[in-house]
A protein has these predicted regions:
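Intrinsically disordered, low-complexity, mixed-charge
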Residues: 15-22, 26-183
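Bacterial N-terminal signal peptides that target proteins for export
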Residues: 2-14
């Protein structure tokens, strides 16, 4: 009889614990999403922003701040991009993007809020080419987000970008990503 009561108490306690866990679990998951402060923006950059390294510069900001998204040339000479990740990091990236590259001019950035895509885990430059490197065949240059989600130093960005560039290019374009080593 004593064993029977002990068994029922144990079952009752276990059932209560499961109910508490199931009730708390969704709240914890929601809190983690809020703690990450994930947001997304879409933007268009006008001015002299094509054939001046602009999309690669945007991707380097994504690498530094570990942001997902994409950058693509528009037929009207502008660049379209999306950034997704930590809101403060997006703001930092946008500051640099608004300054442009050394070769760009008349840079004007307009942004708007965009929907967050839970499955987006990369930043892609669509159809990337490089006049200064002699790369005319378009490649999609893809940066997979880092885990853990960290900000890295500017000096580390170039090495990561060169690695993903070299993994994207093929054939006669192999070895051309590093401008410092091109003859």
């Amino acid at each position: 009889m004593r064993t029977h009561r002990l068994f029922h108490r144990t079952i009752g306690i276990a059932a209560s614990m499961i109910c508490i866990f199931v009730t708390i679990a969704p709240v914890s998951a929601k809190s983690k999403v809020n703690d990450q402060n994930v947001t997304a923006v879409s933007g268009t950059v006008t001015g002299n922003v094509q054939e001046v390294g602009f999309r690669a510069m945007i991707q380097k900001q994504a690498i530094r701040y570990n942001l997902a998204g994409s950058a693509e040339n528009n037929t009207d000479g502008s660049v379209r991009f999306t950034l997704q990740g930590d809101n403060d990091r997006i703001r930092q990236a946008l500051k640099t993007i608004s300054k442009g590259t050394k070769k760009s001019s008349n840079v004007n950035v307009s942004t708007s809020s965009a929907a967050v895509s839970q499955n987006l885990k990369t930043f892609t430059v669509v159809g990337w080419t490089s006049v200064s490197r002699g790369i005319t065949h378009p490649y999609d240059v893809v940066f997979p987000l880092r885990n853990p989600d960290t900000v890295i130093k500017k000096g580390e960005v170039k090495a990561i970008w060169l690695k993903i560039c070299e993994s994207a290019v093929k054939g006669e374009d192999t070895g051309k990503c590093d401008k410092d080593s091109v003859d």
